[in-house]
Amino acid sequence: MTKTLHARPSAATDTTFAPPVITGTATEDALEILFHALLDVARRHDPELEDVLHGRADISSFTPEMLARALQVQGIWFQLVSIAEQNAAMRRRRHVERDQGREALNGSFAKVLAEASARGIGPQQIHALLKDLRIRPTITAHPTEGKRVTVLEKLRRIYLVLRELELPRWTERERNGLMNELRDQIELIWMTGELHLEKATVEREVAWGLHFFDETLFEMLPEMLLSLEESLAQYYPDETFEVPPFFQFGSWIGGDRDGNPYVTASVTRETLQRNALASLRRYRDGITHLGRVLSITERSLPVPETFRSELAHMLAESGDARAIANRNPGEAYRQFLSCVLRKLEATIARNKGARSVGPDYPSADGLINDLRTLEKGLADAKCGALATDIVRPVRRMVEIFRFSTVRLDLRENSTRTTKTLHALWKLRNGDREPPALDSPAWKDWLLTELARPRTPETSFEDFADRLPDDARETLATFALVGEMRDTLDREAFGAFILSMTRSTVDVLGAYLLAKEAGIFLDTTGTEICPLPIVPLFETIDDLRAAPAIMKELLGIPVVRRSTRWQGGVQEVMIGYSDSNKDGGFIASNWELYKAQVRLTTLGNHLGVPIAFFHGRGGSVSRGGVPTHRGIAAQPPGSIQGRFRITEQGEVVSFKYANRGTAAYQMELLAASVFEHALLSEGNGNGSRAEFDDALEALSGASRAAYVNLLQAEGLVDYFQAASPLDEISLLNIGSRPARRFGAKSLSDLRAIPWVFAWSQNRHVITGWYGVGSGLKSFIDVRGEAGEALLRRLFRDCRVFRLVLDEVEKTLLMVDLEIARDYAGLVEDAGIRARIFGMIEAEYALTREMVLRVSGDSELAQRFPQFSERLRGRLPTINQVSREQVELLRRYRSETDEDKREAVKSALLLSINCIAVGFGATG
């Protein structure tokens, strides 16, 4: 039964915001509480907005200032709705686990291992998987996150208060106190403001990323490993498993130089130090807590001799044994922890650049060993439960996060690395012009330099001052790797990502820069690069070339030696964003799939496993799909327990802002990798010759239609006029410019603003354009047999089913009437008619063909939760979109600076509101 709160008036459909409709699902109570709390705040600060929230106000007559306030309150409401939905999802998962057992919970280790055990998968396969398991979600700032850290903190508090309000134990007075706190937090968000008043800095982005570790990840990731251990014990009770710290986080924040001039070597150094301090301070808190709770006296529990011996060594090393013993007489475990704490404090001081005042921990390994000693000391004293429940979580935390919190990747564009190599060439060849990049002479020079022994006379420091600033900066960043690995933590760095890799020489060039910067190691007379060099293949042409490039690369001795030293696995990154921008949705997904199949086959042939790093964004257009289904649709054999993925912007906030959601999302990711490795690796689904042939044909036809639009005369002019493309940069939500190298061409526009702007103007072409033409062409050529084959693909081929499902969801976000309003901003009538006409026709065709293949009568029939959630938000999003069209028109034409500034504030809030409403930006 549906319950409607604040029913929307039937009149004024296009000029009022829709009030919330509460559907009687698990979100009902939370939504009602939040709506009334927001109403109370509105009445207190801006009574006119009460009518806006009730859907009674005609906003078309609002001044820009009043419209800005209305948009702000609506944006706050969308964020509160998201909190209520997360809260309800958490409650549903608890109910399932309580009523049916954990194995009934989708995305849980218990469900995967229950099925594995039932299928007869033995413990040896589990042991082998645990040995190879490597999962690393990698946080990127990328300009897609509109929430400020201070707002994130308040939203988290609202989430926690909602959880408290679920409990029946409160008196009326206590419940009123919680309600007051809820209103206070909403009021603080109201007064804080949603917009960044200044351009984001890398330093602020680093703080944003670390916020999620402080709030949730430091605590919840060890809990996730415990969940796996419990499930293994339940379904393989006769086997003992050692669960390694296989799940770690990576980061690009402070290391991603691609197109961001603000990420310098000094910024990267500061980032590494801040990352280290975040983990060290957390460990200090953990050790301090252990010292408080482990109040065990020798009178009540004899201390094992082996532990007493370790304590004596620690006390002697501290140089202050008497003071420590006198402070905690007869409390051996507290004395031990006092020694640990002193070493940790000295490590923190060293990290800050202060002179060490005593022994410290050169690396995380020392702290891990000391915590193991403490665990063993408790276990030997018959306090194994205390060791497991109290000490082990802290030790697990250190094993996972070490002294770096995250493994920081460095990323640079191949254009920049090539410029640096050219500078080196000229330095050593009397300013002669270097050979062409595709010439044998250039490759020969790279190989010769890589083979040349490095001597003190050729050290980077000796010739740095003769290089251009850009080249010196690039080499300084590489040099930082050696410095920080020696002084901070050997796992402080992840890899060097070479974006826009187009050839073998691009990658060899990165190896040479690493050598020139002095980070190569000499092992038994042969040099290796300790930093993994990871090629990033982004465009469709580059994805097609990837197998040949990697085959040649892995045949080069220095590359092969380095890969072997790094663990024997070669990582390859594949980009979803640029391949989509390059060729459209079907072509991008199919080329990514084929590249993985071919690279996996190549790696198996060469005896060098290929591990894939998936460069996905938050939106469907940039690879954002449901975690479980996205992993299940990867080619058989392509994961093998190794999985990396980027987590960007609003995706990070959604997944990791709250502990319950973070725990679920991390287990979902890890369990999905488990499932693919244990239950799907031998599944040839979707790779049969008939299916491959069909997908190849669909890819070609859909890409042709998509490229036809990209090449249509006037598309760039249309896009800039009919979307807030240029205005998005005013949001100040990222430190990185929207365009690489300051160019103004479509090809150089970053994929994020490309997707962001098309979603704002309700065309959303990046998630569907060309699909209808591809499907129609296939049926036109192959007739009834072709249509039947498409239906079999839809039923049996995971990758095709995933693509079509996501296209269908995207089509629900499109509104052609609103899109037509945006098109009205294009002054050239010919361009407007031509481009919008193409989009309108392709939309109708895509909708028709998707329904024809799926057999459904309406879009998203198979996704009732998704469609219900979206349809509940669309009336308000639609009205904000209509207002945005007028705001764009006024902002672009207004000449009075004060009036233009007022319009700008409302315009930026409209962009933010639409993004929050849809739950995605770029």
Swiss-Prot record:
Keyword Magnesium: yes
Keywords of this entry: Carbon dioxide fixation, Lyase, Magnesium
GO terms of biological process kind: carbon fixation; oxaloacetate metabolic process; tricarboxylic acid cycle
GO cellular component, one term: cytosol
Ion transport found in the keyword field: no
Active site location: 142, 581
Lineage top rank: taxon: Bacteria
Stretches the record annotates as Disordered: 1-20
InterPro entries linked to this entry: PEP_COase (IPR021135), PEP_COase_bac/pln-type (IPR022805), PEPCASE_His_AS (IPR033129), Pyrv/PenolPyrv_kinase-like_dom (IPR015813)
Annotated coiled-coil segments of the chain: none
Enzyme Commission designation: 4.1.1.31
Chemical reaction(s) catalysed: oxaloacetate + phosphate = phosphoenolpyruvate + hydrogencarbonate
PROSITE patterns tied to this protein: PEPCASE_2
Cofactor: Mg(2+)
An example Gene Ontology molecular-function term: phosphoenolpyruvate carboxylase activity
Major enzyme class: lyase
Matching PANTHER family: PHOSPHOENOLPYRUVATE CARBOXYLASE
Protein family according to the UniProt entry: Belongs to the PEPCase type 1 family.
Function: Forms oxaloacetate, a four-carbon dicarboxylic acid source for the tricarboxylic acid cycle.
Protein name per UniProt: Phosphoenolpyruvate carboxylase
